[in-house]
Amino acid sequence: MVDQSPRRVVVAALLLFVVLCDLSNSAGAANSVSAFVQNAILSNKIVIFSKSYCPYCLRSKRIFSQLKEEPFVVELDQREDGDQIQYELLEFVGRRTVPQVFVNGKHIGGSDDLGAALESGQLQKLLAAS
């Protein structure tokens, strides 16, 4: 027979409440991260999701600097929610690597993709379209 004293029932109820609150907060945080990513992409001409020490990210930033363009840069290694943003990018574009570059809301990709878009002239067309 299971002892279901009132004290154990209260403890179990409190434990369930804490778990449900934590799940609710996690869902809220995920929605907040998703909203941040989408807002950054839609509100800025150029967005680079980057890490400050990453050589590929530095290359991407240098390309825009040479084009006299100033991207909105999100340095994931300098944010508490950087890992969550990377997982959101995985859901959104299928990649969680950095950099991830967006121009006028269009996903360009990583550093190699950006270099190819520059070489083909596609990047310049996207930048001129804004």
Curated annotation (Swiss-Prot):
PROSITE patterns: GLUTAREDOXIN_2
GO CC terms of this entry: Golgi apparatus; Golgi cis cisterna
Pfam name, any one: Glutaredoxin
Start and end residues of each Glutaredoxin domain: 34-130
InterPro entries (alphabetical): Glutaredoxin, Glutaredoxin_euk/vir, Glutaredoxin_subgr, Thioredoxin-like_sf
Magnesium listed as a keyword: no
Origin: domain of life: Eukaryota
Keyword tags: Cytoplasm, Disulfide bond, Electron transport, Redox-active center, Transport
Location within or outside the cell: Cytoplasm
Annotated S-S bridges: 54-57
Function: Has a glutathione-disulfide oxidoreductase activity in the presence of NADPH and glutathione reductase. Reduces low molecular weight disulfides and proteins.
Family: Belongs to the glutaredoxin family. CPYC subfamily.
Protein name stated in the entry: Glutaredoxin-C3
Gene responsible for this protein: GRXC3
